[in-house]
């Protein structure tokens, strides 16, 4: 009865600590300066998580300062940081005027709306056409963030705000801006990423189609591909009676299919427009085109957008029954996840691999999973940090014996001396636990065995909260917050069951190793996820309960972890179904002298 209120009160205590730091201009400025001076991307992520949780409580001036800081982060060399910063910019614009505000008289225009839209227009200009003093690579990083900002803003904003923000964005396609090269490419890439229903409202559809068609003959190959790719998406919303149907058909006929990639896009456009696709089908599915695509995708000179389309082309080959190269295609996708320079290509390859996983045989699945696992063990975090998201889901296609083997190897990696390897192993366990409910549908096991494996995964994650390295503890906090209690995939009843089992242990471990300033931000974010879960479950599911210990045993005297007989006795009692409590007194052990607090940690 005390555990749940304690979590809520402790979350309140952490909120007060963080809000106190955000409350005054001086302290808020100090936080931004500390975040700007951080070199380690994981520490930067702690600040981003904190802003993500508390940005709605900031005043307008603080929001402007935060958006300015996030814009600077778009230059960061870490793709994950750029993506997270971009999504947060979109969220802050969507919620710019949200929160508790004074009620205005009727018919009085809101001056804050004008401020938000003016700021939005200003930043759109800086995103599409960055400062000329930046290097080409820095400009590309900023321009590439445009789509993540737009998608985040459109997803999170209300209908009224969404229309206002999108209306400002669409002005870039009215023909008044003389755009060439990269700005055109990234605008087209942004349109490709946005919801189709938003792009097809009113006369926007024709405007966007004309913009795409006008750049189909661009001398730059990547702009051509981007324009045709946008046309492929927009033609899904063009019925035969539409005013722009003839325009789209004429443009589709004008596409020069000089490469297999352009031919594939033309085939998809013809399909959307209900045109005859016999000639395209003959080339695509009548000949072996897979080996040429493999070669093209592994070339560093190939534009990333070409690789992205080729990934869909390879998956399409399998969908049309060409299974001869299935293992090679999946192995190719796993290689792209591990070595591709462009983050977007890695995610496209990962999604395609998961889509085809069910077609592989057991041996083939195991082969791919082992290759991905080897990628974790490399220790090059720049390459391995994108693997957990896909290895965690892919491993759930393995039969029980092989899945247990993967979990055991991840368990071994948690003891690695390299913090980066521990972090990716921990992330993989988080994804495994988050998606584990799918496993019981694919492989029939007794409920007892299935539940035991789930508890093992949870136990491995919790064990990292007791790690002696603060960075590992922070990663464990992140996994518990995002992959368990903040998950959109896990069912509420599964969260409740896990909470009832780990609540007391979690409460103790969170309080035991409080860490420094950055750990406060990680802990506050995790407690926010737990608090939201508790509130949601109590509102719709009933009371959140914690499990009680039926059989308890106290180990007499001082427990010595360096003595195998002590450990053996404790394990034996535990196997009998008892929860064993160990005592550590103030005196040193006889075999290995250590200070009291160090022994407590062990």
Indicate where each model-derived feature is located.
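Core solenoid repeat modules with strong leucine/isoleucine-rich periodicity
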Residues: 245, 249-282, 289-295, 299-316, ...
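Long alpha-helical scaffolds in large eukaryotic adaptor/regulatory proteins
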Residues: 15, 58, 77, 96, ...
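Core helices of alpha-solenoid repeat scaffolds
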Residues: 20-29, 59-70, 112-124, 158-169, ...
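Alpha-helix N-cap/helix-start positions at coil->helix boundaries
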Residues: 2, 37, 41-42, 79-80, ...
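Conserved hydrophobic register position within alpha-solenoid helical repeats
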Residues: 4-8, 43, 47, 85, ...
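Hydrophobic residues within the alpha-helices of tandem HEAT/HEAT-like
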Residues: 12-13, 51-56, 89-97, 146-153, ...
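Nucleotidyltransferase catalytic core that binds NTPs
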Residues: 447-448, 454, 458, 470-473, ...
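HEAT/HEAT-like alpha-solenoid repeats
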Residues: 28-39, 68-75, 109, 121-133, ...
């Amino acid at each position: 009865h005390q555990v749940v209120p304690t979590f809520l009160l402790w979350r309140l205590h952490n909120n007060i600590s963080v809000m106190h730091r955000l409350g005054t201009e001086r302290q808020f400025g100090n936080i931004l300066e500390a975040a700007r001076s951080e070199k380690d991307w994981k520490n930067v992520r702690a600040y981003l998580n904190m802003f993500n949780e508390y940005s709605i409580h900031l005043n307008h001036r603080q929001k402007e300062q935060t958006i300015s800081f996030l814009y600077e982060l778009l230059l960061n060399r870490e793709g994950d940081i750029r993506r997270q910063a971009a999504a947060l910019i979109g969220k802050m614009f969507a919620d710019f005027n949200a929160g508790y505000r004074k009620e205005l008289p009727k018919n009085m225009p809101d001056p804050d709306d004008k401020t938000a839209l003016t700021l939005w227009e200003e930043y759109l200009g800086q995103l599409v056409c960055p400062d000329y003093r930046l290097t080409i690579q820095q400009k590309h990083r900023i321009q590439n963030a445009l789509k993540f900002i737009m998608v985040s803003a459109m997803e999170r904003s209300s209908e009224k705000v969404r229309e206002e923000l999108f209306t400002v964005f669409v002005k870039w396609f009215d023909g008044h801006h003389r755009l060439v090269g990269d700005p055109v490419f990234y605008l087209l890439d942004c349109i490709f990423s946005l919801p189709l229903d938003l792009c097809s409202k009113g006369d926007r559809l024709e405007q966007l189609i004309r913009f795409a068609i006008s750049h189909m003959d661009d001398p730059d190959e990547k702009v051509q591909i981007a324009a045709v790719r946008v046309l492929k998406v927009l033609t899904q919303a063009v019925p035969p009676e539409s005013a722009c149907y003839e325009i789209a058909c004429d443009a589709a006929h004008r596409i020069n299919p000089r490469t297999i990639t352009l031919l594939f896009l033309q085939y998809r456009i013809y399909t959307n427009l209900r045109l005859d696709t016999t000639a395209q089908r003959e080339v695509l599915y009548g000949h072996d085109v897979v080996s040429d695509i493999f070669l093209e995708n592994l070339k560093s000179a190939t534009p990333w957008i070409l690789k992205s389309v080729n990934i869909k082309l390879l998956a399409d080959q399998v969908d049309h029954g060409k299974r001869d190269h299935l293992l090679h295609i999946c192995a190719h996708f796993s290689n792209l996840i591990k070595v591709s320079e462009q983050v977007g290509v890695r995610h496209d390859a990962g999604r395609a691999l998961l889509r085809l996983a069910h077609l592989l045989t057991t041996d083939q699945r195991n082969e791919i999973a082992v290759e991905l696992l080897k990628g974790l063990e490399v220790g090059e975090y720049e390459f391995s940090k994108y693997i957990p998201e896909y290895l965690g889901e892919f491993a759930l296609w393995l039969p029980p014996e092989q899945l247990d083997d993967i979990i055991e190897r991840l368990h071994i990696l948690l003891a690695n001396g390299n913090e980066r390897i521990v972090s990716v192993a921990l992330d993989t366990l988080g994804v495994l636990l988050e998606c584990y409910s799918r496993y019981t549908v694919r492989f029939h096991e007794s409920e007892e065995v299935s539940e035991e494996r789930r508890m093992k995964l949870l136990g491995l994650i919790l064990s990292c909260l007791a790690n002696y390295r603060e960075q590992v503890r922070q990663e464990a906090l992140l996994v518990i917050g995002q992959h368990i209690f903040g998950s959109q995939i896990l069912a509420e009843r599964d969260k409740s069951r896990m909470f009832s089992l780990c609540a007391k242990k979690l409460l103790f471990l969170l309080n035991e190793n409080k860490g420094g300033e950055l750990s406060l931000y990680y802990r506050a974010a995790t407690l926010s996820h737990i608090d939201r879960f508790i509130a949601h479950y109590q509102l719709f599911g009933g009371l959140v309960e914690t499990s009680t210990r039926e059989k308890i045993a106290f180990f007499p005297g001082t427990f010595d972890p360096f003595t195998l007989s002590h450990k053996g006795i404790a394990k034996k009692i535990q196997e009998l179904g008892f929860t064993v409590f160990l005592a550590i007194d103030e005196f040193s052990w006889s075999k290995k002298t250590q200070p009291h607090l160090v022994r407590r940690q062990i």
